[in-house]
């Protein structure tokens, strides 16, 4: 059976996951928390004032945007794309009361049909806002990493591999996982005949119950 390039890339990631699961039970390999960015104001009358993406692990991500216009704003959507070797995209309508200045929210659930994204997943998102005059604005695409915001995350990195951990006392274990992942990549690249191009993010928890 022949395995295509995309299939080999997925197999390489799967092998890395199996190696790391042998080192620690609670590991999520994939692609912060809560952050806030300001969109550029559109040249027209319709403008975006503020936008946020907030991790709510393990349920999903909450998106919020505030916009205003001289005409009633009546349609807002958030577009998102999961980055990585297998890219998935979609959009959802946001909830708000129509008006000249509105704040809209939408919750993208993790775990829905074909829509599971583990901690460490990188997403790209943007908002589209329309008002009754026909004006429309699309914000610039922003990158967001889905991480559990209960913890202050630290990282160790080597090449394309990054291990996320919390608590300085766990740095040694994180470095061990980083080395194991790097060795697995080195061993498997000749076998699969590919060189990885996408970042690999490994999120590790101290205890299973976390």
Give the predicted meaning of each segment.
Residues 24-153:
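Glycan-association/targeting regions that enable binding to alpha-glucans and other polysaccharides
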Residues 152-210:
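Juxtacatalytic substrate-recognition/specificity segment
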Residues 18-24:
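Core hydrophobic alpha-helical transmembrane segments of single-pass membrane proteins
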